[in-house]
């Protein structure tokens, strides 16, 4: 054992399939899998550990179940259990570089998604495999000719980040003069027992190759079973060469999803938010901490819940969510969403940065059966990990 001891505090809620990350007070110089042991029961708890950008140790764990107010005291054991290799077999998130433009993400040897960079104007995740083993985002325009799929909006690339008016450059569409997001490097592409992590460093360029915005995008893919697949997104935009104006337009989403065509709201799908609003009419252009979009894929009810963290810029965000399948968080399009009552223009001063923080959950059923209300509490008031 070492001198690192932690306590897990569940808090006043039951927790099911709950990911937890925390930054420790000190830099313990841990990197990779860290094994924690409950000395009372002998149970082992694997975690992923790394040194973050602030030079502190960050750890991630996943808890299949915690009871109300449960406390678990754990100590770090650098050797781990004798049978750790068998315990870890198949139970990991793997991030594998497939090519210079593709990274495959698997959970317990089952495909989740593929990250594409420097392709189709901006990074995106496609395909995305849902709770029952079928893709639950639209395949067009990456794949053409799939029976029954809609073919509108070719800039809707499964799961992506984009915005339509950045210093008057269109970073949303794929029109002739549209901007691009060029991935300059991928400094982190790590596998783990609790989480797989990818960090992208992007430049948002105009058609002439000039840029005023740099982006750091971190994606965390948690080791959770199908029906509970969870990804955390942190998008940080920085003005590097001049002030940057984000103009007011509905055309954008700092996190965007195009759901599978069979899930569309006008094909029997269901859009709902945390306040009980249902459908495009009640949810489009409204503020809410989370929105859920569910529908049928090959006879199974599945959905996406998009949750915004309170630390995110202009929380709670407005939602650009449509019956035809678009699902995106847009904190700038206030003029459109409020029929001219408010203006969402925002100027980011040179050297300044803004951050957008979301969790995306792919689930079985609708928002009620997937317990998205409880999942939001897990996100914003997660169990605590404290050093003792």
Predicted regions and their residues:
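Hydrophobic residues positioned within well-ordered beta-strands of beta-sheet architectures
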Residues: 20-22, 59, 74, 198-200, ...
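Short, hydrophobic/aromatic-enriched beta-strand segments in well-ordered soluble domains
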Residues: 70-81, 109, 200-202, 217, ...
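Active-site/ligand-binding surface loops and adjacent short beta/alpha elements
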Residues: 243-245, 249-318
């Amino acid at each position: 054992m070492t001198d690192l001891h932690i306590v897990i505090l569940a808090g006043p809620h039951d927790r099911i399939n709950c990911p937890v990350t925390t930054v420790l007070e000190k830099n313990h110089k841990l990197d990779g899998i860290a094994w924690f042991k409950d000395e009372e029961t002998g149970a082992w708890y694997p975690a992923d550990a790394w040194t973050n950008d602030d030079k502190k140790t960050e750890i991630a764990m996943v808890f299949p179940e915690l009871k109300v107010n449960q406390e678990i005291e754990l100590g770090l054991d650098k050797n781990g259990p004798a049978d750790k290799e068998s315990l870890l077999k198949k139970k990991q998130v793997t991030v594998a570089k497939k090519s210079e433009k593709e990274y495959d993400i698997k959970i317990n040897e089952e495909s989740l998604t593929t990250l594409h960079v420097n392709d189709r104007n901006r990074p995106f995740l496609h395909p995305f495999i849902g709770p029952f083993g079928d893709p639950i985002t639209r395949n067009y325009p990456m794949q053409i000719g799939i029976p029954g799929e809609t073919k509108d909006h070719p800039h809707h690339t499964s799961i992506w980040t984009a915005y339509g008016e950045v210093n008057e450059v269109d970073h949303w569409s794929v029109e002739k003069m549209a901007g691009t997001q060029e991935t300059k490097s991928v400094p982190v592409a790590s596998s783990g027992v609790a989480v797989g992590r990818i960090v992208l460093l992007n430049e948002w360029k105009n058609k002439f190759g000039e840029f005023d915005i740099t982006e750091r995008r971190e994606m965390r893919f948690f080791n959770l079973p199908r029906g509970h697949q969870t990804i955390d997104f942190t998008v940080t935009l920085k003005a590097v060469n001049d002030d940057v104006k984000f103009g007011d337009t509905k055309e954008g989403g700092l996190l965007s999803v195009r759901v599978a065509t069979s899930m569309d709201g006008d094909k029997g799908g269901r859009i709902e938010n945390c306040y009980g609003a249902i459908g495009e009419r009640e949810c489009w252009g409204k503020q809410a901490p989370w929105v859920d979009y569910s529908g049928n894929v090959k006879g199974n009810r599945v959905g996406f819940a998009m949750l915004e963290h309170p630390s995110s810029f202009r929380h709670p965000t407005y939602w650009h969510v449509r019956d035809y399948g678009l699902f995106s968080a847009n904190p700038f399009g206030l003029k459109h969403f409020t029929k001219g009552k408010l203006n969402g223009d925002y100027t980011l001063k040179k050297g300044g940065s803004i951050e957008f923080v979301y969790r995306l959950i792919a689930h079985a059923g609708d928002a009620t059966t997937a317990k998205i209300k409880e999942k939001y509490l897990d996100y914003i008031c997660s169990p605590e990990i404290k050093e003792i």
